[in-house]
């Protein structure tokens, strides 16, 4: 199996509902190790820059307004097939159709306020990790 790193974001609704520990516990139980983590409040400019690929989609402004509404936790997860495994743990982007037992099914009920974000490919993970973390702030387990 391949050891990978992926970006994970715990979104504002999880923070405001005090479910942070629940999310981290599930990730740790899945043997996804947190190798960098910080709580931040995104500016409008940062949120637009991070989600630029969605700029022409109908939900873009709702997503940006949500992501700047409260702090978020950004973290780097490391483990075997971390990208795929994190996405499986998160569940479908739409919590209403996410499988029971996934993070989105258990902790959210709205497609915009869906609780968590995870990189969807190695390229995305690399870009997203660099967006939030300097190399000297990442402490790999390998």
Curated annotation (Swiss-Prot):
Q: State its cofactor.
A: Mg(2+)
Q: What is its EC number?
A: 2.7.4.6
Catalysis performed (reactions): a 2'-deoxyribonucleoside 5'-diphosphate + ATP = a 2'-deoxyribonucleoside 5'-triphosphate + ADP; a ribonucleoside 5'-diphosphate + ATP = a ribonucleoside 5'-triphosphate + ADP
* MF terms (GO), sorted A to Z: ATP binding; metal ion binding; nucleoside diphosphate kinase activity
Judging by the UniProt lineage, the source's domain of life is Bacteria
Alphabetized UniProt keyword annotations: ATP-binding, Cytoplasm, Kinase, Magnesium, Metal-binding, Nucleotide metabolism, Nucleotide-binding, Phosphoprotein, Transferase
Q: Which residues bind ATP?
A: 11, 59, 87, 93, 104, 114
Q: Which GO terms describe its biological process?
A: CTP biosynthetic process; GTP biosynthetic process; UTP biosynthetic process
The residues annotated as the active site are 117
GO CC, alphabetical:
cytoplasm
SUPFAM superfamilies recorded: Nucleoside diphosphate kinase, NDK
InterPro entries of this UniProt entry? NDK-like_dom (IPR034907), NDK-like_dom_sf (IPR036850), Nucleoside_diP_kinase (IPR001564), Nucleoside_diP_kinase_AS (IPR023005)
Q: Where in the cell is it found?
A: Cytoplasm
Question: In UniProt terms, what function does this protein have?
Answer: Major role in the synthesis of nucleoside triphosphates other than ATP. The ATP gamma phosphate is transferred to the NDP beta phosphate via a ping-pong mechanism, using a phosphorylated active-site intermediate.
Q: How does it assemble?
A: Homotetramer.
**Family, as annotated:** Belongs to the NDK family.
What is this protein called in UniProt?
Answer: Nucleoside diphosphate kinase
Please give the organism: Wigglesworthia glossinidia brevipalpis
Upper taxonomic classification of the species? Answer: Bacteria, Pseudomonadati, Pseudomonadota, Gammaproteobacteria, Enterobacterales
The record's gene field reads ndk
């Amino acid at each position: 199996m391949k050891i990978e790193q992926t970006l994970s974001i715990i979104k504002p609704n999880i923070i405001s509902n005090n479910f942070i520990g629940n999310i981290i516990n599930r990730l740790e139980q899945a043997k996804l190790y947190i190798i960098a983590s910080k709580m931040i409040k995104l500016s409008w400019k940062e949120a637009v820059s991070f989600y630029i690929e969605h700029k022409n989609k109908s939900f873009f402004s709702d997503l940006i307004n949500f992501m700047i509404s409260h702090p978020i936790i950004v973290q780097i997860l490391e483990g075997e097939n971390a990208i795929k495994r994190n996405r499986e743990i998160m569940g479908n982007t739409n919590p209403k159709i996410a499988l029971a037992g996934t993070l989105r099914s258990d902790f959210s009920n709205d497609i915009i306020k869906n609780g968590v974000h995870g990189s969807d490919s190695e390229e995305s993970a690399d870009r997203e990790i660099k967006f939030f973390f300097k190399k000297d702030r990442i402490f790999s387990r390998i």
